[in-house]
C-alpha cells in the first residue's frame, strides 16, 4: 500500500496530527481501476456488500434488484448496487441497465395489486438511500464547472434527478441537485446566483404541457443571458410541441447524457 501511495497510484491525505490516511473516495477509485476484491468491506463503511449475493444465473441484475426492492430488503439492495459500482460499472450503466427496468416494473404493480403503491414508495426510499450512499463514494471535483438542476414543477420523481447529478459528478462537474418539483422561477434564481455552465431539467410528469412549453422559452432566455446549456430528459418530453432551441438538448438516457457531456466538455476545453 505504501508503495502504491508513494508512486502516486492512490491518493494520501494527512491528518491534523500528521498521520497519513487514504480518503475513502481514493480507495474506491483504486479498487475499481484495479478490479480488486474487498475482503473486509466494513472497514470502508461498506458492510452492505456482505449482504449482496453472488449473481444468479437465471436472474438479470435488474431482476435481482427488483426482487430485493419489492421484498423491502434494503441492505441487500444497497449491497447489490454498491457491488456493481465497485466492479467498475459507471453510474449511467447502473441507472439505465439496472435501476430503470427494476423501477419501471415496480411502478406498474399498483395496476394489479392493492399494495403496489406501498411497495413502490418503500422501494423508492431504499433506492434513494442506496444512491446517497454511493454518491458519498464519488470523487468530488474541486475545480470543475458548476451544473445544477432538478425535476420540473409537478414532477415528484427523485430518482432521475439524483442519478443525473451523480453522472455529472462522475464526469467532473460540481453538481447541485435542486430535487423534485422545482418551479422554473426557482431554477432561474439558481442559474442567476450560481452561474452554472450546465443545467438539467427532468420531466417525467407534467401538470400542464403548455405551461412547460412556456417555461422552456423562459429557460432558453436565461441560458442565453448566462452563456449556459441545458440538458432535458424524462418520459413527458415526448409530447412537447416546442422545438428545442440552440441552448437546449434532450437526452433519452443517462448513457446518452454521459456521452453528450463528454463531447461538450471536450469542445469547451479545446482551443
What residues fall within each predicted segment?
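Residues in the recognition helix of alpha-helical DNA-binding motifs
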Residues: 4
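Long amphipathic alpha-helical segments
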Residues: 9-139
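C-terminal regulatory/effector modules of DNA-binding transcriptional regulators
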Residues: 113-116, 122, 126-271
